[in-house]
C-alpha cells in the first residue's frame, strides 16, 4: 500500500499481504491512522505499529514491513527513470488530484510553510527546527535519528548518532532526496561531483554506500519530534 498524510508530510509504503488498508478518519499527532480490513487493528502511519481499534480487541503489538518511497518532482523522477508508467489517472473519485488543497511544496507555502502551525496541537514542541521543516528520519529497534533536509542539500553528507551508533546521511541531487546508512566503523566519506568517496578512493552513488542502508522517510519536524 502507498500511503500519504498531508498534515505530517509523510509518504510511506507498506507490504500489506492479503489484507487491504482503509483510512479510519482519526489522527494521532496530526498523522493519519489506517486500519486493516483483516483484523480491524489501527495503524498510525508514522509508527507503522498496531494499536487497539474500536472494532476489535487488543491485537498485541505488531509492526508493518515497509518499503521506501521517494518524495521528488515528476520531472526529476522521469529524468532518471524515463520508462516509468503511471498506473492510472482514474482515481474513482470526482475530486481532482491535480491540485493540492493545502498549498504548494515548490515553493513551500500555505499549510506547508516551514513556520506554519500544525492543524492540531502536536504531541511535543521542539524548537530546534521550525515546526514544518522537512527532515529525513530513520528509526530502528534501538532508537531514531533525523536530518534536516535543507542542511543535507547544502552539506551533501551529514553525520549523526542513532542510539550511540554512528550513522551518515547522503544527498542525491538527481532525485532531491536523501539516504541514511549505518556507519559502525565511523568511516570518513567525502562528496565529489555527485558521488560519495571513501578513504580508499572507492566511489559510490548516494543511494549505495558500502554499509547497511536504513529505511528512511521525509516528515515535518513537529511530527517526527512528536513521535521520536
Feature-to-residue mapping (PLM):
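Mid-to-C-terminal functional-domain signal that highlights helix-capping/loop sites
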Residues: 1-228
Amino acid at each position: 500500500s502507498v500511503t500519504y498524510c498531508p498534515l505530517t508530510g509523510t509518504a510511506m509504503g507498506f507490504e500489506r499481504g492479503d489484507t487491504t488498508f482503509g483510512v479510519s478518519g482519526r489522527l494521532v499527532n496530526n498523522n493519519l491512522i489506517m486500519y486493516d480490513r483483516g483484523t480491524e487493528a489501527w495503524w498510525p502511519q508514522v509508527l507503522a505499529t498496531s494499536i487497539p481499534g474500536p472494532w476489535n480487541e487488543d491485537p498485541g503489538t505488531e509492526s508493518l514491513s515497509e518499503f521506501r518511497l521517494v518524495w521528488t518532482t515528476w520531472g526529476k523522477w522521469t529524468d532518471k527513470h524515463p520508462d516509468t508508467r503511471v498506473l492510472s489517472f482514474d482515481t474513482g473519485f470526482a475530486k481532482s488530484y491535480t491540485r493540492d488543497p493545502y498549498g504548494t511544496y515548490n515553493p513551500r507555502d500555505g499549510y506547508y510553510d516551514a513556520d506554519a502551525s500544525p492543524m492540531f496541537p502536536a504531541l511535543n514542541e521542539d524548537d530546534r527546527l521550525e515546526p514544518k521543516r522537512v527532515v529525513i528520519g530513520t528509526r530502528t529497534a534501538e532508537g531514531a535519528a533525523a536530518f534536516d533536509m535543507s542542511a543535507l542539500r547544502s552539506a551533501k553528507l551529514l553525520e549523526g548518532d542513532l542510539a550511540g551508533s554512528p550513522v551518515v546521511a547522503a544527498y542525491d541531487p538527481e532525485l532531491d532526496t536523501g539516504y541514511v546508512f549505518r556507519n559502525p566503523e565511523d568511516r570518513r566519506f567525502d562528496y565529489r561531483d555527485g558521488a560519495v568517496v571513501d578513504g580508499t578512493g572507492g566511489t559510490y552513488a548516494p543511494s549505495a554506500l558500502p554499509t547497511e542502508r536504513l529505511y528512511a522517510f521525509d516528515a515535518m519536524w513537529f511530527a517526527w519530534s512528536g513521535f521520536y
